Amino acid sequence: MTDLHPLLSRLAAVPGMDAGAPRLVLLFSQLGDFDSLEYAQALVPVLPQLDRVGIQVLAIAIGDGDGADRFCAFTGFPRERLQVEADASLHRALGCSPGLQLPGGPWPALFLMCAGIGSPGTLAEVVRGYTGDRRAPQCFDDEAVVETGVLPAFPAALFQRAGGHRFQRPFELATVRLRNMNEVLRHWRTYVPSDRFITQRGGTFLLAADDSPLYIHRDRGILGFSATMHRPLAFLDPWLQADAAA
């Protein structure tokens, strides 16, 4: 069983995050990691609901203040709910995977992880972004104009022509990831001040008011920030449904 003391000690110093209320703590990996951006983008729309049901939210990522500022401006995640660490000490203390480790350093390891080596589930998740997923919600409103910074802007209604609506259409999630990738690569050193931790994985810790764990997930590989990637916030259903019913 994981010793949560390093996390609880950290939270005790953060106003509103000590014991007494349920807390959702997101250990993002690097600020420039696909998982970090995609997880934040999934969370932003439900933050008001989590506030209403009394769940306090804090994200802790590897990076620095400049990276955190840009990350929040791009994803819409509240800056006051994001803290940064210069290294992966907290992640390691909480049992999060360091990712593939090779004598050649982090870059060869990262490339292999992107190919699914030492990164369970990555290739299947990449493919899902292109093929679509009827279990998942659509990513773009049909009235939206999609801008990736790479392709010419186009109406999101094109996805409806490709596969329908009210579910994740072919190429839709891949387009979200292309936009995220373009943002990170254009500002790499802002998002990733040190390459030492580019393979580090993150985790999710949902704590009860008495500090006992309600839910824990540790990422096993790239694009693995949830056990249910088609609905990454499914673990919050009991609280989100309670808010919807209120």
Report residues per predicted region.
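Short acidic-hydrophobic, aromatic-tinged amphipathic segments that line or gate anion-handling sites
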Residues: 8, 80-85
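Structural microenvironment flanking redox-active thiols in thiol-disulfide oxidoreductases
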Residues: 39-74, 90
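Thiol/selenol-based redox catalytic cores and closely related redox-interacting motifs
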Residues: 85-221
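A short, polar/charged loop-to-alpha-helix boundary motif
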Residues: 220-241
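A short beta-strand-turn-helix
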Residues: 1-23
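Short active-site neighborhood of thiol/selenol oxidoreductases, capturing the structured segment around
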Residues: 15-50, 56-57
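Residues lining hydrophobic/aromatic ligand-binding pockets adjacent to catalytic sites
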Residues: 55, 200-201, 230
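Short acidic, S/G/P-rich loop/turn micro-motifs used as interaction or catalytic elements
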Residues: 30-34, 65, 221-222
